[in-house]
């Protein structure tokens, strides 16, 4: 996406909690637990569930998620296994939600980093990504506050009517 491999992790509200740009191409399945550790260290909260694309799926990752009492929403590599997992309501719902993450990468890339990204060299691309994530998250927080303000009068009216 960025001329280098980028890992983006977000919460259900769309706020990016973890990102990393890699100089060399890295296997997705090897990146998962470093990301979860950074989220835990940064927020102090245990991740309740992980939803990814096929690149992150591995028996070792699924086993470790189970041992950590974290919902395993890793998209299976085998289509038959994916069809089977899509019968599970929570898995299917979270996989549909994952499509928003793909869109989030597009928003980050085109809306906040520019197309093409003008930063040359790894250090400058890494810095541009950091600024892009910060700007994106400020935008998301402002949108969340705006939505909350719109909902507040309705809640007050409903409470007054009760």
Feature annotation, model-predicted:
Residues 11, 35-42, 68, 104-107, ...:
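Generic, well-ordered alpha-helical scaffold segments in large soluble proteins
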Residues 1-48, 52-54:
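Polybasic low-complexity intrinsically disordered regions
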Residues 23, 76-81:
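Short, acidic/turn-prone active-site loops that include or flank metal/cofactor-
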Residues 68-77:
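Short hydrophobic/aromatic-enriched beta-strand-loop microsegments
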Residues 89-162:
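Basic, amphipathic alpha-helical segments enriched in Lys/Arg and hydrophobic/aromatic residues
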Residues 81-89:
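Short, charged, surface-exposed secondary-structure boundary motifs
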Residues 59-67:
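Short glycine/threonine-rich loop-to-helix capping motif typified by GTGT followed
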Residues 51-59, 79-80:
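Acidic, metal-coordinating catalytic cores used for nucleic-acid/nucleotide bond scission
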């Amino acid at each position: 996406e960025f001329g280098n491999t980028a890992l983006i992790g977000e919460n259900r509200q769309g706020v990016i909690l973890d990102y990393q740009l890699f100089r060399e191409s890295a296997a997705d399945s090897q990146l998962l637990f470093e990301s979860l550790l950074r989220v835990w260290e940064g927020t102090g909260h245990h991740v309740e569930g992980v939803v990814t694309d096929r690149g992150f799926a591995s028996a070792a990752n699924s086993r470790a998620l189970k041992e950590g009492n974290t919902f395993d929403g890793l998209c299976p590599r085998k289509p038959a296994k994916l069809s089977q997992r899509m019968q599970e309501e929570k898995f299917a719902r979270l996989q549909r939600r994952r499509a928003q993450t793909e869109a989030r990468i597009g928003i980050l890339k085109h809306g906040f980093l520019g197309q093409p990204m003008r930063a040359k060299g790894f250090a400058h691309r890494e810095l541009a990504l950091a600024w892009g994530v910060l700007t994106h998250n400020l935008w998301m927080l402002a949108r969340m506050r705006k939505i909350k303000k719109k909902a507040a009068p309705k809640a007050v009216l409903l409470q007054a009517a009760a």
